A protein has these predicted regions:
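Conserved catalytic core of nucleotide polymerization and phosphodiester-bond processing enzymes
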Residues: 1-223
Length: 223
């Protein structure tokens, strides 16, 4: 995408680590919530915890591994899947996952509760109550049930992120009414705005519209 003309510039506005922030907020895990509230890098924080070292000793390789673990957990990654992504032995990957849940125990309980609730109700829901039916959650087929369990875990997280960006789109669209700038595209957690160069004062207003779209519980900040 390119600006409409030289009078315009392309503005990309996106959420930072939004799914992990939602995981922290919905689970209420004190360690994860605390990291976000204090503005610490969550991947460095996770690396320090799973490797059992001070944050200032975390190197780039450890941080990348922790990032893979952080996002993998949301999708119910297995030790085998993690070992494939990291290129490490399955035993090492299993230890990383075990250490993760030891360091963030409330996340583990939260995920187990999501599966249990889906088994009872037949659906998972977002923070705003939008439901996704998961009839396969009680399947006798282990493979089908495992996939449904992963859906039950990531639906509240991904679904809440989707709710948030949709609300943000509505807010930004209203904000741009009567201006020469326009919202042109949404990609995952990012909004693209064709911004007129005489309207750069809209940037902080767009940021505020996105930040205020859907406040998260447990004091977890959006930025």
């Amino acid at each position: 995408f390119v600006p409409a003309s030289e009078e315009y510039t392309m503005l990309s506005a996106d959420y930072s680590q939004i799914e992990l922030r939602i995981m922290a907020a919905l689970s209420g895990d004190p360690a994860m919530c605390g990291a976000f509230r204090e503005g610490r890098d969550i991947h460095t924080e996770t690396a320090a915890r799973v490797y059992g070292i001070p944050r200032d000793q975390v190197d780039a390789v450890m941080r990348r591994a922790a990032k893979t673990v952080n996002f993998g957990i949301i999708y119910g990654i297995s030790a085998f899947g993690l070992s494939q992504r990291l290129g490490c032995p399955r035993g090492e990957a299993a230890t990383l996952i075990e250490n993760y849940f030891t360091q963030f125990p409330v996340v583990k309980s939260f995920m187990e509760d999501l599966v249990h609730k889906a088994e009872q109700a037949g659906y998972a829901e977002t923070l705003l109550g939008r439901r996704r039916m998961i009839p396969e959650i009680n399947s006798a087929n282990k493979t089908i049930k495992s996939a449904a369990e992963r859906t039950a875990i990531n639906t509240p997280i991904q679904g809440t992120a989707a709710d948030m960006i949709k609300i943000a789109m509505i807010h930004v669209d209203k904000l741009l009414k009567g201006t020469r700038s326009r919202l042109i595209l949404q990609i995952h957690d990012e909004l693209l705005v064709d911004l007129h160069r005489d309207e750069l004062d809209l940037i902080p207003k767009i940021e505020e519209a996105m930040v205020s779209a859907l406040p998260l519980p447990n004091g977890v900040p959006i930025l």
